[in-house]
């Protein structure tokens, strides 16, 4: 069952895709994580919505620097409201 996107999720995803297509190739591969920070941001926004997903993406981007080892860092699963 496909989940529908809000207009804000659609816009945020398109902006990140624009970065991936036009800016990232110029900068070259620098992300220390798997999935890359931009793919992580898209997945987080799709799963958690624009506000919470952007928060996860911002925290991830702040960790992406030469002093952090990087590695596999998937998007946290969405918590069920009944099981908090």
From Swiss-Prot:
Disulfide bonds: none annotated. It is a peripheral membrane protein. The keyword Transmembrane does not apply. It is found in: Cell inner membrane. Keywords: Cell inner membrane, Cell membrane, Membrane. GO terms for cellular component: plasma membrane. It comes from the Bacteria. Belongs to the UPF0161 family. Could be involved in insertion of integral membrane proteins into the membrane. This is Putative membrane protein insertion efficiency factor. It comes from Shewanella amazonensis (strain ATCC BAA-1098 / SB2B).
């Amino acid at each position: 069952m496909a989940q529908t996107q809000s207009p804000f999720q659609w816009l945020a995803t398109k902006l990140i895709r624009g970065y991936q297509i036009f800016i990232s190739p110029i900068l070259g591969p620098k992300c220390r994580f798997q999935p890359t920070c931009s793919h992580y941001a898209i997945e987080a926004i799709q799963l958690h919505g624009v506000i919470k997903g952007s928060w996860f993406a911002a925290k991830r981007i702040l960790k992406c620097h030469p002093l952090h080892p990087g590695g596999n860092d998937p998007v946290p699963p969405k918590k069920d409201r009944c099981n908090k």
